[in-house]
Design a protein with these regions (language model features):
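Interfacial segments of alpha-helical transmembrane regions
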Residues: 1-14, 71-97
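A hydrophobic membrane-anchoring alpha-helix module
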Residues: 141-161
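Short, charged juxtamembrane terminal tails flanking transmembrane helices
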Residues: 160-170
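Membrane-interfacial loop-to-transmembrane-helix junctions in polytopic alpha-helical membrane proteins
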Residues: 1-5, 47-54, 77-84, 126-139
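Structural signal for membrane-spanning alpha-helices in multi-pass inner-membrane proteins
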Residues: 20, 66-73, 100, 151-158
């Protein structure tokens, strides 16, 4: 069962890393090119759509699944794999969930008060929002990638431990 948790952990974490990477490299720079009014309007839409059960399952699954994989590895006696999976969960909790809840969500709530009309006001508001939001999204991107790498290493260690034991090696 722990291998199912590893696969789900890798999938959820990779999907989140891809989302954050896309925002860092495509979405935010693209919104900047479209002008402040368009950018504010688009982010209003994105912030509405993101509040979905499917997104929540994947977003929080990237925390829960590594913990379940760590528990499974630990129960199987694969301490190294358990530690790496636990580290992945810790990194994800701090760099992705923590940053999201402490920085990006409050910025999104501020953005919700911006109106689409009034280009001059929107230009100042967008600049005030987009810079910090993008910077902290880079942190989330790097955190998700680092958590993903820890999970890959954890699964490799777990699989290596299984293979070593099947051949009578310690």
């Amino acid at each position: 069962m722990r291998h199912v948790f590893f696969v789900l952990a890798l999938l959820c974490t990779a999907l989140n890393a891809g989302i954050f990477y896309s925002f860092s490299t495509i979405v935010m720079p693209g919104l900047d090119l479209g002008g402040a009014a368009s950018a504010v309007n688009a982010m209003h839409g994105i912030n509405t759509i993101v509040r979905s059960p499917i997104f929540a399952i994947v977003f929080f699954g990237a925390l829960v699944m590594p913990l379940l994989a760590a528990f499974g590895s630990r129960s199987a006696g694969h301490r190294g794999a358990a530690r790496l999976a636990g580290l992945a969960a810790l990194i994800y909790a701090a760099a992705v969930i923590g940053v999201t809840l402490q920085v990006n969500v409050p910025l999104n709530e501020t953005l919700a008060s911006f109106t689409v009309a009034g280009t001059d006001a929107n230009a100042a508001n967008w600049k005030e929002f987009a810079g910090p939001w993008a910077l902290w999204n880079h942190v989330r991107t790097l955190g998700a990638i680092l958590a993903l790498l820890c999970l890959l290493a954890a699964w490799a260690v777990d699989l290596t431990s299984v293979n070593r034991r099947s051949y009578g090696l310690r």
